[in-house]
């Protein structure tokens, strides 16, 4: 039986999200690594300690990082399906998303999408905002 991508992601998170993923996101978005650490809810001290010991992020931080990546992938898929291919060639999706996650949204009770990454219900609420944006509805 072939494993589904969801199972592969589950296994990857269970194995532990490497600290390098934080640096990868920082490079892709242009955000300082400290901002990405803040999204994950991991202190600089913990990050540096885990990085030096070649240990993964703490479980909760790893789940938040994966939620961030999942939301970014959802947005990319939505734009690939319905966006203008010419505009997409020059659109800085990662940079736009990095700014957007820090904007307070009325649809989220004036919380930021970054705040909502703290638990699965908040993550679903952000996914719903993205889906409504795609449909052209007021989020």
Language-model segments: residues:
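Non-transmembrane "mature" sequence context
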Residues: 1-139
